[in-house]
Swiss-Prot record:
Recorded topology in the membrane: Multi-pass membrane protein
GO MF, any single term: transmembrane transporter activity
Keywords: Cell inner membrane, Cell membrane, Membrane, Transmembrane, Transmembrane helix, Transport
Family of the protein in this entry: Belongs to the major facilitator superfamily.
PANTHER family per record: MAJOR FACILITATOR SUPERFAMILY DOMAIN-CONTAINING PROTEIN 3 (PTHR12778:SF10), SOLUTE CARRIER FAMILY 33 ACETYL-COA TRANSPORTER -RELATED (PTHR12778)
Membrane-spanning segments: 10-30, 49-69, 84-104, 109-129, 154-174, 177-197, 224-244, 261-281, 294-311, 315-337, 353-373, 378-398
GO cellular component: plasma membrane
Protein name (Swiss-Prot/TrEMBL): Putative transporter AmpG 2
Subcellular location: Cell inner membrane
Keyword Cell inner membrane: yes
Keyword match Cell inner membrane: yes
Amino acid sequence: MNFNFSRFQYISNIFFILIISFPGGLIYLLTGSTLSFWLRESGFDKITIGLFSLVNFIHIFKFLWGPLLEKVSFAPLSKRGYKYCLIIALVSCICCVYILTNFNPNTHFIPFALCLVAVAFFSSIYDMLLQSSQMLLITNKNWGISEAACTTGFRIGILIAGSGALYLSTIISWQDVYRSMAILCIPSLLLIIIYPLKFKDKTIINDFDRFWYAFYDFIKKPKWLIIVSFMLLYRLQDNFLSIMPNMFYLDIGYTKKDLALGYKAFGMCAAILGGFIGGFLCRKYEYFYLLKRALIYHALSSLSFLFLYFYNRDITSLYIAVFFQEFTKGLTMSPFFSYQLRCCSSKYCITQIALITSIAYISTILFGSISGYAATYLGWTYFFLVAGFCFIPAYILIKYLPPYVIPS
């Protein structure tokens, strides 16, 4: 039997993407949802907790240093330069998380916040490199699968930093929880160090003396303003909800252990399942069909919050509601991220992916920062009703998107 080296390379690259995606999800939650529980137990109100999402504002501007990172990553060190950038970004994230644990948010508010911003900064660099790895290592026909792998690794990181951290917080201090989370990133770091990178297109690592053309290349694409608007609005529902579901579940009587198992662990499994199904469906159906259906299903999931609020608050109902919410969320992500990759040119992948994800992050920061105000002044009923209608702008824009923006 002949050994199929190309298939082995493809599978190993998928596995590599999955493993290095783990720290991305873990660190993402440490500055988001998990942080909200720490702040809540430290005595902060919903409005202040919502405003803490502004620490991730740095993600909005990552496209500004994307070209510099692109030049450093690929020339003159080529694959080694790319690997060095991954290592430096991840090591910096780990160190900043560890430094964060030396501060109490009540007594050392400013240094605590500054450390969070530093974590977000290095996390944004790591995310850019992580997302571009799919374009560098995987052929475009398999981006749906690679995105499912990336989402799975990311979601596992979220699971550990969510369910695992929440459960640990009932046993040890939040400072020790965050130290434990930082240590868990080390296996991914070791894999990055030892894994032999093999880019599918060697032209990617040549001649970036005029890297600013990445922006010009993007605005030459058909209907680029509609693409930008779509990236801004697609995740409007999730961004509006932000970290408020954490507060909602606590307010209606669920304990941290209930949420660790039901909301975080079970919900993450549902999201991973949705992500994989979405990834495989990308190979069978066109993107716009999936994007529309996923948006509608996910919008309906807002009703599950109201079901818990008005009718039933037992554990079984929590699991049903969480499955609906998280499965549909996972279903929306694979076609969305895969379409993002199709909007980028391979030779400018880091800069253009940074630009697109920065645009998407504007919505995350803007609506996440006001979610606390909205939940406080609207009340839970109207808050979740408004969230349910947030899919409409993106749904309308899908009709006007260019069908396929194939990377050059």
